[in-house]
Amino acid sequence: MSSSNQNLAIAANAIDITAPESTIPNKSKVPNKSAESSQSTVPKAPSRREIRAQAQAFIDTLAPLQHTNSQKVYLEGSSADIRVGMRQILQTDTLVGGTDDAPIMEKNPPIRVYDCAGPYSDPEADINVRLGLVKLRQNWILARKDTEQLPCATSDFTQQRLADDGLDHLRFEAGSSAIVRPRRALQGKRVSQLHYARQGIITPEMEYVAIRENMALAEVQDEILNRKAKGEAFGALVGEPITAEFVRAEVARGRAIIPLNINHPEAEPMIIGRNFLVKVNANIGNSAVTSSIEEEVEKLVWSTRWGADTVMDLSTGRYIHETREWIIRNSPVPIGTVPIYQALEKVNGVAEDLTWEVFRDTLIEQAEQGVDYFTIHAGVLLRYVPMTAKRVTGIVSRGGSIMAKWCLSHHKENFLYSHFREICELCVAYDVSLSLGDGMRPGSIADANDAAQFAELETLGELVKIAWEYDVQTIIEGPGHIPMQLIKENMDKQLAHCGEAPFYTLGPQITDIAPGYDHFTSGIGAAMIAWYGCAMLCYVTPKEHLGLPNKQDVKQGLIAYKIAAHAADVAKGHPSAQIRDNALAKARFEFRWEDQYNLGLDPETARAYHDESLPQESAKVAHFCSMCGPKFCSMKITQDVRAYAAGLEAAQTKAEQVEAAAQAMQVTIKTPQELEAAMALKSAQFAASGAEIYQVIDKHVKDKLVAEAEEA
């Protein structure tokens, strides 16, 4: 899933990941331009050289990094090699009574949350990007005995790259003679998770997914944490804990996919489907003018830290092949690509010169490297292109426009459509999933839900059924720019035409008036369509339609989309979704500031915002914030509640005290004048008692109040 400028494409000129120190700028040699820019109020952007140096330093010093007060924990499955990593957020205790010298504290349980960072959040992990991550799934793949290791890569292009000595300094495992040898299904075998699921086999990957989706729900015993409102799932099957059998059944039905190429054993199993947690994709990649391999590895790690469930490498520069190898070997999440981008590079950017042979070799090249899913724009048919003529924004999908131009220049049917069965045969040999691209998606709300968009959607529905014939896991891509009132129609039509295959959308963006804030405008649409049933959301950054995003833009886009995905999970009634909300709400009510930060999606920003206005250490435990101050904080009533509870007589229950107080207030009012007098009396009594909302009422006070009320 990509947009015309969403490619995080950031540089590719000569990208030596093992570059000598001389390639990193020496601060003493950098000209001092402060005098020249002293009048400017705009901070000077770092140079390309500085950005690359920063990225080089990042990967040279890369070590596991965990959020404050969080731990990496593992839950074991049925065998010791099924270890599912999660992030455990530790909480502080709650004050429930006692005195300053002898406080009575109540333990708050740790909260376990989904963790996309893999080894990058495990302090015990040994991280070395030049060696790649541990091959988590290697033994599972070998145990099935349905694949073979090839003597060498079979792609013509890969062989050409390997024969080019000038690229040695760029290769993964640079300086080593070791070459990653790909695997492929044995002749006549199918090795997809869909194939196994249809055979009734629960794979280790399926068991892993079930444990991961539940997030240790069974261990949560706290009544407050387990509270949740009834969800509205629009026909989705949520609300019960996930089992491995349920995962198998959903994959077998085609309603979910587990995108895991057999040549990407480093990836941790995850699932995409509307009956599971909503997932978020982030885009990275180099281009002909910006970025380096170092930067792309840095962005990969950064994206997983902030919650990217999958990452798409949308590289378009000279070193696509080498960049992708580094990314895959260091990625704990599935990697997707748009193969037509690289195929276009191979024909020097001339769409008319594309051929099936060039594209097929590109698929083999990427499948043997370990790409987990391909976006294929096979639904852009020749007869659909004229339907876009009256659009405000025409064809905005890069892949869609490439194939539209090819179709028109040759006046032939899209070769991706014509050769779709061959594509499926190739994919199932590596368990590469297909993401059927929406080349006709609208690029403005003025073009939403038009004939071209829905004609392509119907074709994608035909193609998904063909893919299922070959046991190829498949998802459907969707828009785009859709106003709020038209979003549900998109989801309904996708479910109807595509057999409930998972939906994967870019947004949708619900208005076109906010450049610079499209992570908001699209995040709203993303939350809505995810609630209606969309399984995965492709993030949008603040730079959408404006430029290439930097690291902070990537973080902003991911946070916006994690909010959208989580909001949909809560609305659908996913069994474990609301636990984190409840924990944070309880921490907020109890003024446990550090827990509030740590339970949030972005602890760093939350902490910084609080400290910006109240930086003193005492403010870290204060029972107010700068919004209302100590006198007007609505949540300060928690102190009154505690005082009320502590002052109750030991012989009586809280319920008895409330009932006694209620009975004491029952007086007979006969006239408006009596009512006014009684209200005035109660006002005076409230002020005289200290003007506290919650007060202790013992028997003597009760009797006095009753007497005063009767006298009045």
Curated annotation (Swiss-Prot):
Binding-site residues for [4Fe-4S] cluster, renumbered to this chain: 625, 628, 633
Binding site for Zn(2+): 481, 545
One Gene Ontology term of the molecular function aspect: 4 iron, 4 sulfur cluster binding
Function: Catalyzes the synthesis of the hydroxymethylpyrimidine phosphate (HMP-P) moiety of thiamine from aminoimidazole ribotide (AIR) in a radical S-adenosyl-L-methionine (SAM)-dependent reaction.
Name the record gives this protein: Phosphomethylpyrimidine synthase
Cofactor (UniProt): [4Fe-4S] cluster
The protein's Enzyme Commission number: 4.1.99.17
Assigned protein family: Belongs to the ThiC family.
Biased composition (Polar residues): 20-42
Complex formation: Homodimer.
Positions annotated to bind substrate: 283, 312, 341, 377, 397-399, 438-441, 477, 504
Species for this entry: Shewanella putrefaciens (strain CN-32 / ATCC BAA-453)
Gene: thiC
HAMAP family given in the database record: ThiC
Pathway this chain belongs to: Cofactor biosynthesis; thiamine diphosphate biosynthesis
Gene Ontology cellular component annotations, sorted alphabetically: cytosol
Catalysed reaction equations from the record: 5-amino-1-(5-phospho-beta-D-ribosyl)imidazole + S-adenosyl-L-methionine = 4-amino-2-methyl-5-(phosphooxymethyl)pyrimidine + CO + 5'-deoxyadenosine + formate + L-methionine + 3 H(+)
EC supergroup of this enzyme: lyase
PANTHER family associated with the record: PHOSPHOMETHYLPYRIMIDINE SYNTHASE, CHLOROPLASTIC, THIAMINE BIOSYNTHESIS PROTEIN THIC
Disordered: annotated span: 14-49
Keyword terms: 4Fe-4S, Iron, Iron-sulfur, Lyase, Metal-binding, S-adenosyl-L-methionine, Thiamine biosynthesis, Zinc
